């Protein structure tokens, strides 16, 4: 037991240090035994959560090459955490989902539609995430996947545009950020301009691949608008 705690502590130290990315290959080599600790790190605050998500992506992508069914079971575990029937609030789960799909092309092809379904509100039986705080993460997750595999996320565009008018002000900014990760489209401009001009000061927490930072929803929309009209 003490050895297990020591290994978990070492893993945590690898992720919280300044050179954390240098440890990702070693973490990925650890395989399935690192999955449980990494899931637990999703609850340790924004920076550790994002870095643990990246590590989960690397571990699961490697497993997908060697043990594809095991990797799919990790995705199923993620989907269960997003399910209301699980009794859990899936903090950090959308981010982990996105990083796994960004790291693994086969898993992305199989599961990208599930990730996008969390922002699709059909007004009836659907996968829509109705927890405002968790939905912010869902928008970010789609943007993260769009960075790595934009073609898989093109069908999310109308729902991201709809997200610019989400009832949650932070969700609006996160939807704008996600939209900006897609190939530019002039059709995005009117809705982005409305949000940019709205003076929405809701702080949106973003991750640049190394650190967490904040911008307001209207700032994000203004930057996305600039990109859409180039």
Report the location of each language-model feature.
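Short inter-helical turns and helix N-cap capping residues of alpha-solenoid HEAT/ARM repeat scaffolds
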Residues: 44-48, 85-87, 123, 127-131, ...
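Eukaryotic acidic, Ser/Thr-rich intrinsically disordered low-complexity regions
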Residues: 2-16, 20, 192-230
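Buried hydrophobic core positions in alpha-solenoid tandem helical repeats
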Residues: 37-39, 74-79, 111-119, 156-161, ...
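Conserved hydrophobic register position within alpha-solenoid helical repeats
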Residues: 23, 52-56, 93, 138, ...
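Flexible loop/turn segments at the boundaries of HEAT repeats in alpha-solenoid HEAT proteins
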Residues: 23-29, 60-71, 100-111, 144-154, ...
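Non-membrane alpha-helical segments in proteins
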Residues: 40, 47-62, 76, 92-100
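Structural signature of alpha-helical solenoid repeat scaffolds
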Residues: 57-61, 98-99, 139, 143-144, ...
């Amino acid at each position: 037991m003490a050895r297990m705690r020591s290994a978990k502590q070492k893993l945590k130290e690898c992720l919280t240090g300044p050179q954390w990315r240098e440890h990702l290959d070693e973490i990925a080599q650890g395989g399935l035994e690192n999955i449980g600790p990494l899931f637990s790190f999703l609850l340790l605050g924004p920076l550790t959560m994002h870095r643990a998500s990246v590590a989960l992506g690397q571990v699961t992508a490697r497993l997908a090459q060697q043990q594809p069914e095991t990797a799919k079971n990790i995705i199923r575990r993620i989907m269960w955490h997003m399910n209301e029937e699980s009794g859990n609030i899936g903090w950090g789960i959308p981010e982990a989902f996105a990083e796994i799909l960004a790291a693994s092309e086969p898993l992305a092809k199989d599961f990208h539609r599930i990730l996008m379904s969390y922002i699709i509100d059909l007004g009836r039986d659907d996968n829509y995430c109705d927890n405002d705080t968790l939905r912010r993460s869902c928008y970010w997750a789609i943007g993260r996947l769009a960075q790595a595999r934009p073609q898989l996320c093109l069908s999310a565009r109308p729902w991201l545009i709809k997200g610019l008018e989400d009832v949650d002000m932070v969700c609006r900014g996160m939807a704008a950020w996600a939209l900006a990760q897609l190939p530019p489209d002039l059709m995005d401009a009117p809705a982005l301009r409305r949000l940019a001009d709205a003076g929405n000061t809701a702080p949106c927490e973003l991750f640049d691949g190394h650190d967490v930072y904040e911008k307001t929803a209207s700032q994000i929309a203004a930057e996305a608008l600039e990109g859409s009209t180039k």
